[in-house]
Amino acid sequence: MKKIVVLSGAGISAESGIKTFRDSNGLWENHKIEDVASPEGFARNPELVLEFYNLRRRQLSEVNPNEAHYILAELQKDFDVHIITQNVDDLHERAGSENIIHLHGELKKVRPVNDEESIILWEDDLNLGDLDENGIQLRPHI
């Protein structure tokens, strides 16, 4: 079976209504990337980071995969397709794609602040006081 490797970015999900980071009026317009997308940013201001990603997670629940997502999933019938995405949404998965690597993490996953390996599926808002089984604060898997 022939292999196809796809590198996807913000453009594929923008078509579904996901706000991108670098557009005019984009998500980074009001925030420095290091303030909302780094462990150091979370340590400095966890409330900002949690609210930023809670808003993104809510937005994600209001959109659906678009034709491009479905076409890539459909290719799996005839090819060994691997998708490497810079996106943190789950639109590739919801369209039916299976072999996906998220370079920058995933909105619907969280992890303890002190553990890069333990990753937990998370659908709801994440708040201060949401802890793992060991009592460690959870943070977005971004």
Model-derived segments and their meaning:
Residues M1-I142:
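Conserved catalytic core of sirtuin-type NAD+-dependent deacylases
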